[in-house]
Amino acid sequence: MSHTTVADRINELRSLIRRYDYHYYVLDDPIVSDAEYDALMTELRALEAAHPELITPDSPTQRVSGTPASQFAKVQHPQPMLSLGNAFTKADLLAWRDRVLRLLGPDAIVAYVVEPKIDGLAVALTYRDGRLVQGATRGDGEVGEDVTANLRTIGSIPLTLQATSTPQDDDLPTTLPTTIEVRGEVYMRTADFETLNDRLAAAGEKIFANPRNAAAGSLRQKDPTITAARPLRFFAYGVGVVEGISLSSQWQTLRYLRALGFPVNQDVRRFTDFAEVLAYCEAWMAKRDDLPYEADGVVIKIDDFAQQRELGVVGRDPRWAIAFKFPAREAITRLLDITVNVGRTGVVTPNAELEPVQIGGVTVRNASLHNADYIAQRDIRIGDYVIVKRAGDVIPYVVGPVIARRDGSERPWQFPTHCPACGSPLEREEGEAAWRCNNFSICPAQLVRRVEHFVSRSALDIVGMGERQAELFVQRGLIRDVADIFFLKADQLAELEGFGPKRIANLLAAIDAARQRPLDRLLVGLGIRYVGTVAAQTLVAALGSLDAIMAARQEELEQIPGIGPVVAASIVDFFSRPANRALIEKLRAAGVQMGGVSGPTRQSDTLAGKTFVLTGTLPSLSREQASALIVAHGGKVTDSVSKKTSYVVAGANAGSKLAKALQLGIPVIDEAGLLALIGTTAEPPPSPPPPPPETNTDGNQLLLPLDGE
């Protein structure tokens, strides 16, 4: 690449980055993904490193970024609010450590303070003589915006400070500083964000794309009363200017901030062994979905302030800190088309067809659009650049459009009025978001999905039958209802491509074995609305046979523990339909078992009266095994978290259920906690207060003695 070409590319990169900075920092409306932005910045740094004569003072690599909006008064930060360099791999982290050790010298003893990197809005809070006098956003790192009135409305930000200490904190100052600038992150918990969006949607107002945008948009309101109504929170992570006291390390600073009354992330740790730092990063990357807030990485800082000063700052990045970035969970790509799928209950769901995009190491080509209201509220159009999110085991979904990238070619999309599979008019019940095809008996798309569900592992578990086989058998007219599965013949299957003698024999044997599945599995397979594994086992345990369940009145069903009015009404409605009763008789004629339950026999009443919700992946128990274990010891398992929930059992990649439990103050336990409850009638506190700092044999402090929030 010629010198002129390099200069042109550098100017192009700077222009792009400035534009993206403006949208991200000033408008709070990012138009590219973090991964795209990081790639541009990495390229610019590499080109400038190779051609230092082209570096200019106004390059994005030489200053922080952004320009404050004009609607708030500007605030000059007494010390720059620096950004952090990024590490994406273990090799990047080791390279950073090696640079630090090389600069500090071979005899340096280094400790590291690490914590999850919250995806919120950075602010600086200035206190004089213990009183909050000013609060400002980060802005461009040099100049921010005065949002004092709005920050005062956040309950977790103290308006006055009071120094306290305990014997274990004998290294902390016992007096208040004359001036202290506390830096931290304003954020919104995931559950609070979802509740806020629901409220805004119900009022017909614009909703937010993600918790960070919600926090930023809420904090930058001209009317503080609007901010006060938003569920904002604050975590302190450091200080700027400090006068009147002396602080010597990041670890001491965090404990002092906690003593002053600031919430500090309880997951902060201090290590002297860098291997522990690497393990911490790997652990949080694996369980990032366990957090009740959005986190996009881990921040690592050199603990000792004297070492920080010795290491200094290069351009916009301090040498003494780095951010380990998690793989992206969001990306921006183009929405090529919107199609619809018809489910087994007739619900018609819109689906986004996307330009393929990598998210967290997976190529995403399709994503959920949830329902018609979701599309309308976000004004999602075909041809839009859209934000796509993939988190944990959640199906990828479209967050919303990037309005700033529209060029006028985008087309609004209209939800169909008729079923794409059978042509029946779509209907929507009052109070529901879903449109349905109610042509239950004839719609081929619904039949395919019902067959898939009927043969699934949680139902009749027919090995060798799945989506492709269901579509083929329905298309060929071999299956007109799920009972027809049991009347398939070898000569019919032999006419189908790919079905040889061995495959036919295996499939027919699997179908024959399915006749003997317990009744609760058949109930699940029938697809009765609201009747899942636990409800089916409860029904069979209480009533014993399918005939008894079919004959039960709604009032009788409601008397069964765990079967409420909604579930009871759904069961009565299902069995009142002549087509469904005819299906049952056809299954009976096919020799399908109509009694028995697959759940465990009652072993004890240890968990009697307690209600559990399961979320995430447990270390050794499957979801079904954990549910069966709870039921066997007298407990009840439900699908949703409420104030009536006794415990939430959380494993890896727990999602919104965990967040809601934390919001409601529901006790959260892991698999070991569940087993402990079953083994004893005592109820150990699921979230004990943190003990004083412990030290392992390497001298690593394992737990910051902070309660957080």
From Swiss-Prot:
Record-level GO cellular component terms: cytosol
GO terms for MF: DNA binding; DNA ligase (NAD+) activity; metal ion binding
PROSITE patterns linked to this entry: BRCT, DNA_LIGASE_N1
Domain BRCT, residue spans: 602-691
Classification via SUPFAM superfamilies: BRCT domain (SSF52113), DNA ligase/mRNA capping enzyme, catalytic domain (SSF56091), Nucleic acid-binding proteins (SSF50249), RuvA domain 2-like (SSF47781)
GO biological process: DNA repair; DNA replication
Keywords of this entry: DNA damage, DNA repair, DNA replication, Ligase, Magnesium, Manganese, Metal-binding, NAD, Zinc
Domain of life: Bacteria
Residues annotated for Zn(2+) binding in this entry: 419, 422, 437, 443
Cofactor(s) needed for function: Mg(2+); Mn(2+)
Assigned EC number: 6.5.1.2
Enzyme class, spelled out: ligase
UniProt-annotated catalytic positions: 117
Amino acid composition bias (Pro residues), ranges on this chain: 683-694
Residues binding NAD(+), per UniProt: 34-38, 83-84, 115, 138, 185, 301, 325
Catalytic activity: NAD(+) + (deoxyribonucleotide)n-3'-hydroxyl + 5'-phospho-(deoxyribonucleotide)m = (deoxyribonucleotide)n+m + AMP + beta-nicotinamide D-nucleotide
Gene3D superfamilies: 5' to 3' exonuclease, C-terminal subdomain, 6.20.10.30, BRCT domain, DNA ligase/mRNA capping enzyme, Helix hairpin bin, Nucleic acid-binding proteins
Keyword set includes Cell division: no
Pfam family, one: DNA_ligase_ZBD
Annotated segments matching region Disordered: 679-709
Protein family (similarity comment): Belongs to the NAD-dependent DNA ligase family. LigA subfamily.
Role description: DNA ligase that catalyzes the formation of phosphodiester linkages between 5'-phosphoryl and 3'-hydroxyl groups in double-stranded DNA using NAD as a coenzyme and as the energy source for the reaction. It is essential for DNA replication and repair of damaged DNA.
Protein name, per record: DNA ligase
Source organism: Chloroflexus aurantiacus (strain ATCC 29366 / DSM 635 / J-10-fl)
Lineage of the species this protein comes from: Bacteria, Bacillati, Chloroflexota, Chloroflexia, Chloroflexales
Chain's gene name: ligA
